[in-house]
Amino acid sequence: MTKTNSNTDVDYEIMIVGGGPAGISTWLHLHKYYPELAEKTVLIEKAKYPRDKLCGGGVGGWSELILKHLGVQLDIPSLFISDLEFRYGKEMNTLHQPNCFRMIRRNEFDHALAKHAINRGLQLNENEKFLNMNRRNKSLKVKTNKREYLIKTLIGADGALSIVRRKMKLPNKSHLVPTLEIFAEANSRYDSEFDEKKIVLDFTPIKEGLQGYIWHTPCIKDHKPFIGHGIANIRFCKDKSKGNMKEIFTKELLSRNIHIEKKLWSSHPIRCLSENDTISKPNILLVGDAAGVEPATGGGIHFALSYGEVAANTIVNAFQINDFSFKDYKQRFQSHLAGKYLAKCTYLANQLYVQGISPLEVAREIFMIN
C-alpha cells in the first residue's frame, strides 16, 4: 500500500518515523491544520501493513472524539464495551459507562488509520527503517536503509524502544514497563468477558509483590470471539519487590485452562512518561510510546492520538515563527487534556503502588470519564 514518489532524491520538510496511531495522528492533524506542511511530510514505517502490535486493543478515553474531529470512521471488526470489572482478591467492583471502550485488533486498526491518511495524500514508505541522523546547519540529515533525507523536523513515533529517542541521547533514565500477553479463543466455561461485553482488570497480583495488574480483554479475531490475556508490571516504585511476572501469569492462565508454552507468549515494553523526562530537542519531537504514557496502567491509544494533535500544533507554530527549538512542546502537552490526565494518573499510581490505597478505589478514578 506504499504511496511512492518517483523523485527519490526529494528532500521533505518533515519526517515521521513510525506508522502507528501516534505517527498517523500527527500527519492527519497536520493535514487538517496546515495541508501545505502535510504535503511536505514523509512517513516511514519499518514493516508492511498489516503488522502485529502487542496491545490490549482498547480504544478508550477520548479517542473517539479525536477520530471524529479528524473525520475518521474505521470500518473494522470491533466490540463495544460498557463495563470495567476491577478485582482485588475476593473483592470486586464494576464501573459502568456506555461504550467506554471499543475493542479492536491493532493490526487492523493501524492499517485502517494508515489507509485514511493515504487517501488524503500521505507519502508513506513501508519497509523503510530509520538508522541515524546528523545535524546539518539548522536541519537534520536522516539516513534510512533506503536513502538519505534533509529535513527541518523529525518526529519519533517508533514506539517504546524508539531508535529516534536512542539517537537523541537524552539524559533521563527510561521507565520501561514489561508486559506479557497471549490471545486465546474464548472458552465460555472460563471466560465470561466476551459474552458479558466487559474488560477485567485484576490487581490481586499486588499481594504477591507485583506493581501492576492482569487484564482480560475480549475482541474479535478471524470472525471468532477471542480474549486477550496479559500482565503488566509497572514498577512505579523501584525500591519495592518486582514480583514474579511469569509465575503469576502462568498461574492465571492455568486457572482458565489455558496451556500455551512460554515461548509463544508475546512480550514488549510500555514506556511511561516521568515528570522530568525530556521529549524534544531542536528539530526533534517524540510522540506516543516513544515519549511515554501514564504510569498507573500504561494505557496508550488515546495518548498516541493526543500526542499527534499536540505535535502537529507545535510543528505548525515552529514553521510560522521559524523557530525549531521546540522548547514549548512539553508544556503544550502538559496543558492538553492528555497531559492533565497523565498528571492525574501519576498521582494515582503513587496512591496505588506506594501508598497502598485500595486498588478498587484507585481504578475507578483512573477510568472514570468526566
Which residue stretches match the model-derived regions?
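Glycine-rich FAD pyrophosphate-binding loop
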Residues: 15-19, 29-55
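FAD/FMN-dependent oxidoreductases across multiple families
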Residues: 130-132, 237-314
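Conserved N-terminal glycine-rich FAD pyrophosphate-binding loop of Rossmann-like flavoproteins
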Residues: 47-70
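Short beta-strand to alpha-helix junction loop
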Residues: 56, 96-116, 236-244
